[in-house]
Amino acid sequence: MAFVPPQAGYDRAITVFSPDGRLFQVNYAREAVKRGATAVGVKWKDGVVLAVEKRITSKLIEPSSYEKIFLIDDHIAAAPSGIIADARVLVDRARLEAQIYRLTYGEPVPLTVLVKKICDLKQAHTQYGGVRPFGAALLMAGVNEKPELFETDPSGAYFEWKAVAIGSGRNTAMAIFEEHYRDDIGKDDAIKLAILALAKTLEEPTAEGIEVAYITMDEKRWKKLPREELEKYINEILQEVKEEEVEEKQEDYSELDQNY
């Protein structure tokens, strides 16, 4: 008789809690996010920036065809991590809800309303049979009365952040935010911080492997950062990192000299 692990029954059904209060399929969906490409967001007083890792697995893929920041409405965008096919379903649903709200009320949908609708859908996929949780998290950002930045979890939970990261490089990026983010940060510094946090998660950051978009309260329309500007930011960051490494080595040598 084959050995069956004690948690097997709870493992196969998304609607059954384990004895210790967990839904294993939701945990597995979170693991899919942890293995996904890194996405980061940073908010400043007058806007929000999103930056995403583009995992281009073949040199034959056209980089321009591989979008990772999705426009939901003029004033709202989303950056996913996890199973991109699942994320695309959520993005399509968000676009539909945004259109319905605009046609019904004659005004753009508030980001908080849209986030709640998407997370209601995510939560429903943890509660009913015949479906599975979405293996994707979304960073949803935009402006209405103020800039807003939300993280949506596969469980249906959502959180508003000043700066946040999802995906495989979350811990590294969040450490950068904890160290460098400040409440009075401006647009240029916010964009640079987002790129820095993302670059720290990559072995060789390049303009082809990173996508950046931002929105301001003045224009209320998302703009993609041109490649020339992105390369400029990356070069500045790499230069600063090299200078920091040189300073650290000099400090190490000074300590060794003192010990001798």
Swiss-Prot record:
Any one GO biological process: proteasome-mediated ubiquitin-dependent protein catabolic process
Superkingdom of the organism of origin: Archaea
Matching PROSITE patterns: PROTEASOME_ALPHA_1, PROTEASOME_ALPHA_2
Database matches in CDD domains: proteasome_alpha_archeal
Cellular compartments per GO CC: cytoplasm; proteasome core complex, alpha-subunit complex
Means of activity regulation: The formation of the proteasomal ATPase PAN-20S proteasome complex, via the docking of the C-termini of PAN into the intersubunit pockets in the alpha-rings, triggers opening of the gate for substrate entry. Interconversion between the open-gate and close-gate conformations leads to a dynamic regulation of the 20S proteasome proteolysis activity.
Disulfide pattern: none
MF terms in GO: threonine-type endopeptidase activity
Stored InterPro entries: Ntn_hydrolases_N, Proteasome_alpha, Proteasome_alpha-type, Proteasome_asu_arc, Proteasome_asu_N, Proteasome_sua/b
Record's keyword annotation contains Cytoplasm: yes
Compartment(s) where it occurs, according to its Swiss-Prot or TrEMBL record: Cytoplasm
Family assignment from sequence similarity: Belongs to the peptidase T1A family.
Function according to Swiss-Prot or TrEMBL: Component of the proteasome core, a large protease complex with broad specificity involved in protein degradation.
Full protein name: Proteasome subunit alpha
Species whose genome carries this gene: Thermococcus kodakarensis (strain ATCC BAA-918 / JCM 12380 / KOD1) (Pyrococcus kodakaraensis (strain KOD1))
